[in-house]
Structure formats: C-alpha cells, structure tokens
C-alpha cells in the first residue's frame, strides 16, 4: 500500500484491513435478536415525522441487497465510509462504502455516514473529517456524519496514552470540521462511556452536537420503548443483532428521533462512478507456506 500524507491510496489490502480498529471492537456487547422485516411489516413503528427507523452498516455485512432492505421499510442507513488504522495511522476507505451509498441512495433509503477514528491529535481529527467530507461529496448525505471511536483503552491502541480531555478535544475538532464542510455532525459512543462523563466529556459534546448512543436492552424496541440512557441523545442504536432482508449478517439497528422531509443534494456536481460490491469483504485470508504441484502438465502462453 502506498501512503500519501498518512492516507492510504488503495481501498483494499489484507494488511490494512487487519489493522481496522472496528474489527477488534465488535461484539463487546451483544444486543437482543431482532427481525427487522417482521417488526416493520407488523406496523409497530410509530408513524411520526420525528421518529425514523434505520440501520448502520460496514463491510462486515458483506454484499447488501439494498432493494430488499428498502422493501423491508428501513428509512435510513448510517454507512461506514472509512477508518484510521490503529497501529500505522493510515486513513482507509471501507471497501463497500461507495457501493453501499450508491445502492442505498438508488433504492430511496436516506443515508448518513460514520468514520471510525484513531486520531491522536486535533490536526489528525480535522484531517479525518476533511477526508470524509471529500469522500462523500458526490452522494446525497441527508442524515448526520458521525464520529466513532472505540478501543482506546486497549494497550495496542495508538490512543492508549491519551487523556479523556484530549480525546474529547479530538472528537470536537472532527465534529466541528464536519459542520464547517456543510454536514450535520453527530457523536457516537456506548452508554457506559458517556454517562456521567465516564470516558468522554459528554457534557461538552452534547452542548453543540447530536448524540448517537449505543445501549442494548435485553428486550428490544418496541417492547422497550426508549433507551435508559438519561443523557441527551438524538439517535439510539438498540441492538447489533438485527435481521434485515437483503443482509446476510447481523446488523446494528437504530431509532432516530428526527427525520427529513426531503433528500439533501450532493455537495459535488460530479456524478460518482458506478461501483460494484467488494466480493472479498467477508473472506478471511491466511498466509501459507505450502508447495503446490500440478497433476497435469500445463502450457502457459501470453497470446490467444
């Protein structure tokens, strides 16, 4: 992978994907299983302009059939567009980000975005925000652009030595730059990290920016009508075990206490190139040192 200014110029390498910080921070908490298709078709969601129903996805959901997702009633999708690696600090695009934005948009699902940060300075956080704004500029980003940062207490994290105040400054720098670039900023974290300013100075962040809280009740929505997080929040991720038509893997499911009548215009006038899904998104590759011997003679040539 060639790196320019700490930004990886390729979107898919085994080395870089192995250093994906989200890969090591999934499954810390497990939510209740939810069949989203059954939930929405049953008419259990409040029909209100102030409450909307969505999912958040990354390459870990594989190739998504967005027409089926749309038919299930999902109204919005928060799509991971990239991450900064936890060891080398490279910014890397999620290998299915453009495909997911393209297809969700084409099927009438309103889209937002999120970025998985491992920034260690406010300058790096601003760099991440600018990278995100440039990357999504050709798409109709109606929902917020969120900052996601986890695993910072792991000894192998490049953020391990940061103080809570430094992490918060870094998050605010990202969110402020996203706002300056014309998008709605939002901060994502788990309930136990935000409550009482436990791991973040939430009281500082919530004064200006939307909060997206992750909190998984044992009995999911709609039986549990709302999160028990008592802080201000605009979006609630209530399980990571959702079942949605068109998605082969469990998916995070969200309730937003806001919606949009229309769809935002893309910031760029350039039409995005049509892309295909990353066929290798769910494949695991291992290094081997084996000798392969052909059973039959094979003639290789470089012309027909």
Model feature map: region roles:
Residues 47-175, 179-181:
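Substrate-binding cleft of extracellular glycoside hydrolase catalytic domains
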Residues 178-196:
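Aromatic-lined carbohydrate-recognition surfaces of secreted/lumenal glycan-active proteins
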Residues 111, 184-186, 211:
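Hydrophobic anchor at the start of a short beta-strand
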Residues 1-2, 178:
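Gram-positive cell-envelope targeting signals
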Residues 125-133, 194-204:
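Distinct, well-ordered alpha-helical segments
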Residues 2-61, 204-279:
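Functionally critical loop-and-helix segments that line ligand-binding/catalytic clefts
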Residues 268-299:
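SH3-family beta-barrel domains
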Residues 302-304:
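Short alpha-helix capping/helix-loop boundary micro-motifs
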């Amino acid at each position: 992978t060639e790196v320019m200014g700490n930004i990886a110029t390729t979107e898919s390498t085994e080395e870089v994907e192995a250093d994906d910080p989200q890969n090591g921070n999934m499954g810390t908490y497990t939510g209740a299983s939810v069949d989203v298709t059954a939930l929405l078709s049953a008419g259990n969601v409040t029909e209100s302009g102030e409450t909307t129903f969505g999912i958040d996805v990354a390459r870990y959901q594989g190739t998504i059939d967005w027409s089926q997702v749309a038919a299930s009633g999902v109204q919005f999708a928060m799509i991971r567009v990239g991450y900064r690696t936890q060891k080398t600090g490279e910014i890397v695009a999620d290998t299915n980000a453009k495909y997911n934005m393209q297809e969700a948009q084409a099927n009438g699902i309103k889209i937002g975005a999120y970025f998985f940060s491992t920034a260690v300075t406010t300058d790096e956080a601003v760099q991440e925000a600018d990278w995100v704004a440039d990357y999504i500029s050709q798409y109709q980003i109606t929902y917020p652009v969120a900052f996601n940062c986890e695993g910072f207490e792991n000894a192998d994290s490049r953020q391990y030595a940061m103080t809570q105040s430094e992490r918060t400054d870094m998050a605010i720098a990202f969110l402020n730059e996203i706002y300056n670039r014309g998008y709605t900023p939002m901060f994502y974290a788990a309930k136990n990290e935000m409550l009482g300013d436990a791991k973040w100075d939430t009281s500082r962040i919530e004064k200006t920016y939307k909060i997206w809280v992750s909190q998984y009740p044992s009995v999911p929505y709609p039986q549990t009508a709302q999160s028990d997080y008592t802080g201000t929040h605009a979006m609630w991720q209530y399980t990571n075990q959702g079942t949605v038509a068109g998605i082969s893997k469990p998916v995070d499911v969200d309730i937003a206490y806001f919606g949009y009548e229309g769809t935002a215009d893309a910031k760029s006038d350039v039409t995005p190139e049509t892309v295909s899904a990353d066929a290798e998104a769910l494949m695991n590759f291992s290094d081997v040192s084996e000798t392969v011997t052909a059973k039959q003679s094979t003639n290789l040539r470089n012309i027909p």
